[in-house]
Amino acid sequence: MKGIKSKMLSRGKSQDTQKSSKKKESKKSNSHDSSKAPKESPSTDPNGSVIGAQNDFLTVPKHSGKKVPIDTTPTPRDEILLENVRTVRKQRSSLYHISENRNLVRLPSFTDVPVNKWHSLALEKLEQCCVVFDFNDPSTDLYGKEVKREALQDLIDLISVRKEAIDESLYPSIVHMFAVNVFRPLPPPSNPPGEIMDLEEDEPALEVAWPHLHLVYDFFLRFFESPSLNTSVAKVYINQKFIRKLLVLFDSEDPRERDFLKTTLHRIYGKFLSLRAFIRRSINNLFLQFVYENEQFNGIAELLEILGSIINGFALPLKEEHKIFLSRVLIPLHKAKSLPLYYPQIAYGIVQFVEKDSSVTEEVVLGLLRYWPKVNSSKEVLFLNEIEDIIEVMEPSEFLKIQVPLFHKLATSISSQNFQVAERALYFFNNDYFVHLVEENVDIILPIIYPALFEISKSHWNRVIHSMVCNVLKLFMDINPSLFDEVDAEYSESRRKKEDEEIIREERWTILENIAKENAMKLKSQNPTTVHSTTERLKKLSLDYTNG
C-alpha cells in the first residue's frame, strides 16, 4: 500500500525521539552496573527442535515485577509528536474459544504407518486439529501450535494423494473440525461506521490465527473437490445452519479469508443442489440489509463474484425470481457509497443479465439512470463504464427504447466541468458499435446532444475535451450533413431567441429598479396622483411581460 511507507517513517521518527530521551536516563541509572544480561536461549520441544528461532512466533521478555512510578502527564512536545504520528494497523484476532487442554503429542505421518491404520490415524489428527490456540500471545503453546500445523498439513497431503482414504465415516469429524476452527465471532470493524475503506491507503486487518486457519480452509476445499464425495451423506452436516454461519464470515476484514470463503461457498453451491435456492435467497437478504440498513459489509465483492457465475448458468427464459433479484437487489446496489469496492463484480453481473435476456435492457438502463450520482465524479465515471459495457451487448431494438433518456444523460456528462467525466462520456464515440447505433438513429440523437457539444466546443477549459468534442461534431457532420446544418440552424435560432429574451428581461428589471427608486423618493410626499401613476405603470409592465 502507498500509505504504509509514510506510516512506517512517521512511526520511526517517534521511536527515535523516544530512544534519544531514554539514553540520558539509562546513563544515570545504569552507570554503576557494567554487567550485561545474558541472552536467552531458544526454547526446544520434546524432540529437541528449536522453536524460539521461528519467525512466526516471537518470545516476550519477562517482567521484572518492580513497580516503577511513571509520569503520564503529556508535555507540549509529546502532543505535537502524537498529532503527526499515524499508527500502522496491527493484526487482530477474532474472538476464539481457546481450548483448555492444549498439550498435543506429535503423531506419526501417514507414510510411516500401514494403510490399514490410516483411518484411525486420520481421526486422531482431526481430533488434534479441533484444539484452538491463542495467537494473540505468540509466545504461548509453541510446540502445540506446530503439532497442529503438521497434522493439518498431513491431512491435506493425504486427501490430495489418496482421495479414497476419506470415507463417509470421517464426514462428521471433518465438518466438526472446520466449524470449531472457522466459525467464531468476528472482531468489530477497524473503520468507524460510515467510513469507506481506501484500498490504496488503508491496510486490512489480518487474522493472526491465519497460520492454522488457511490450512483448515485448504483441507476443507480439497474435501469438496474429492470425486468420491457422497453429497447425500454430507448434506446431513452441510445444511442451512452451516450456510448461515458461513455467510456471516464474509464480513471478515482479511481478504485472504474472504477469498477462501468465496471458493468454499461456490463449491457447496455446485455440489449440493438442494441448497441452491437457500443460498441465493440468503445472499439476497444480505444484500438488502446492506443497501437499505447499514452499508457495512466487507464481502459484497466476493458474493457478487459467486452470483456472476450463477447468473451465467441461468436457463432461458429467466425465472421471475431472477428478474426480481435484478430489479430489487442488483440495481439498487449501485447507490451505495462503497460501489468502487465491488464495481467489477456488479458490472459483470448486470452485463450477464442483459446478454442472457435482452428484454431486461430497458429496466437496467433506466435503473442506472435513476441512481446516477450527482456530485461524485469518480462514481459517475464508473456508471459511464457500465453503460458502455451494456451497450456492447444490447440489441438494436432495445436501444430504441432507451436512446432518449440515455443521450440526455450523456449530454449532461459531456457538459461536466470535471474533465474525467466529460472525457469518459466522449469516449463512447470511439466504440464502433455505439457509432453504428447512432448512425441509424441520428435524427433523434443529434438534436438532443448537439447543444451540449456546441457549448463545450466554445467554453470548456480543457484542451483535450475541446479537441474530442470537435471530432464528435465532425463525425455527426459526416453522418448526415443536411441534418447537421438543420440542427445547427435551429439551435442558432433558439440561442438568438434566448439572447433577445435575456435583453428584454434585463430591460424590464431596469424599469422596475427605476420605478422603485422613483417611488421611494415620491412616497414621502404622500401624493395620491403619483401613487396612482406608479400603479398604472406597473400594471402595464405586467401585461407586456405576460404577452411576451
Swiss-Prot record:
SUPFAM superfamilies: ARM repeat. Residues 1-75 are annotated as: Disordered. Residues 27-39 have a biased composition (Basic and acidic residues). GO terms for molecular function: protein phosphatase activator activity; protein-macromolecule adaptor activity. It is found in: Cytoplasm; Nucleus. Keywords: Cytoplasm, Nucleus, Phosphoprotein. Gene3D superfamilies: Leucine-rich Repeat Variant. Transmembrane segments: none annotated. Its main location: cytoplasm. Residues 1-10 have a biased composition (Basic residues). Coiled coil: none annotated. The modification Phosphotyrosine is found at Y96. The keyword ATP-binding does not apply. The modification Phosphoserine is found at S99, S109, S542. InterPro entries: ARM-like, ARM-type_fold, PP2A_B56. The keyword Nucleotide-binding does not apply. GO terms for biological process: deactivation of mitotic spindle assembly checkpoint; meiotic centromeric cohesion protection in anaphase I; meiotic sister chromatid cohesion; mitotic G1 cell size control checkpoint signaling; negative regulation of septation initiation signaling; traversing start control point of mitotic cell cycle. GO terms for cellular component: cell division site; chromosome, centromeric region; cytoplasm; cytosol; inner kinetochore; meiotic spindle; mitotic actomyosin contractile ring; mitotic spindle pole body. The B regulatory subunit might modulate substrate selectivity and catalytic activity, and might also direct the localization of the catalytic enzyme to a particular subcellular compartment. Has a role in cell shape control and septum formation. PP2A consists of a common heterodimeric core enzyme, composed of a 36 kDa catalytic subunit (subunit C) and a 65 kDa constant regulatory subunit (PR65 or subunit A), that associates with a variety of regulatory subunits. Proteins that associate with the core dimer include three families of regulatory subunits B (the R2/B/PR55/B55, R3/B''/PR72/PR130/PR59 and R5/B'/B56 families), the 48 kDa variable regulatory subunit, viral proteins, and cell signaling molecules. Belongs to the phosphatase 2A regulatory subunit B family. This is Serine/threonine-protein phosphatase 2A 56 kDa regulatory subunit delta 1 isoform.
